[in-house]
């Protein structure tokens, strides 16, 4: 969404927060955004140069500086601008190892070099999340970062992207699955600043083919209990928010080229059943879903399956999301 002006953004955000305040739950609205700072050769012709925000290189351009301190400075500047606009979660950085040069999302990554990606990930997240002078690093200048895409979106088969059915698989012919995890384990989950780890993680659309070592499922990453619950939550100890990529519970298109839902591996399930499967896998939040009905239907199905008391006891999503909301001192 483009912004007419800083004033318009602030008015819109203030009105939205007032609406949330009047619900009685005391939960502020968390506005998130894909990267807004990238400058490109076509920006002037697309009418986005007037947006009230500074322009920087994209991921691969930031890496070309070979300077993590510069990237941290960008994060500090970017977070100040985001907070001024009412944005409190950055749907970035994209920390996939870009090992497939044909991939259309290559330019948004920090490149193919593992250690460079680790260093840039730390700098980016520390810059966006840290408020200086606070005990835990969180405060009025902090913006949550949502690192993407777990467990690494780079090894896309043939360079085809998983936004489309023809690119639904991530493959590991060289058995380098563990290498693609390093930007998460050594970067996003091991920050140098006081916030310690990226606040949120987004799994990619892909089916990480033959990577499920426990249940043997070839399903999209957000539906894969082994990857989210067993690996990310338990083995790696991640206790932040897990948010799905956009539209994974929606129906697919009629052709492989159609830009539609991305429920890879669970096309046979209903929309509500897909929500339930993702929740059972361990996700907290659904990206791009604007309808609460299938979520409530999934909750009802879970109550029937496990019992209401057990279902409520199993849910830790509220704890993750509440921390995500309040640590920024809204």
Ranges and model annotations:
Residues 1-322, 327-328:
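Glycoside hydrolase catalytic-domain context in secreted enzymes
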């Amino acid at each position: 969404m483009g912004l007419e002006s800083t004033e318009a953004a602030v008015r819109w955000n203030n009105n939205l927060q007032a609406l949330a305040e009047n619900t009685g739950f005391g939960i502020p609205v968390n506005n998130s955004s894909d990267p807004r700072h990238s400058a490109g050769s076509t920006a002037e012709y697309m009418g986005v140069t007037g947006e009230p925000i500074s322009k920087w290189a994209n991921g691969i351009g930031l890496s070309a500086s070979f300077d993590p301190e510069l990237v941290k400075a960008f994060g500090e500047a970017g977070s100040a601008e985001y907070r001024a606009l009412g944005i409190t979660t950055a749907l970035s950085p994209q920390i996939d190892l870009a090992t497939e040069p044909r991939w259309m999302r290559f330019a948004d990554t920090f490149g193919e070099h593992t250690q460079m990606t680790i260093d840039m990930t730390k700098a980016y997240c520390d810059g966006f999340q840290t408020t200086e002078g606070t005990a835990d690093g969180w405060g009025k200048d902090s913006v949550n970062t949502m690192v993407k895409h777990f467990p690494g979106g780079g090894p896309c088969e043939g360079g085809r992207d998983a936004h489309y059915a023809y690119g639904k698989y991530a493959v590991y012919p060289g058995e380098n699955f563990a290498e693609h995890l390093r930007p998460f384990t050594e970067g996003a989950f091991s920050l140098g600043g006081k916030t310690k780890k990226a606040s949120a993680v987004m799994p990619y659309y892909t089916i990480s083919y033959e990577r499920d070592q426990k249940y043997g499922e070839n399903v999209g990453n957000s539906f894969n209990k082994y990857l989210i619950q067993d690996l990310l939550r338990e083995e790696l100890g991640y206790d932040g928010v897990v948010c799905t990529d956009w539209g994974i519970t929606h129906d697919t298109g009629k052709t492989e080229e159609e830009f539609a839902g991305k429920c890879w591996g669970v096309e046979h399930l209903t929309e509500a059943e897909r929500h339930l499967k993702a929740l059972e896998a361990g996700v907290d939040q659904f990206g791009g879903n604007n309808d609460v009905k299938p979520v409530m239907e999934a909750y009802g199905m879970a109550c029937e399956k496990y019992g209401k008391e057990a279902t409520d006891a199993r849910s830790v999503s509220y704890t993750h999301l509440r921390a995500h909301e309040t640590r920024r001192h809204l």
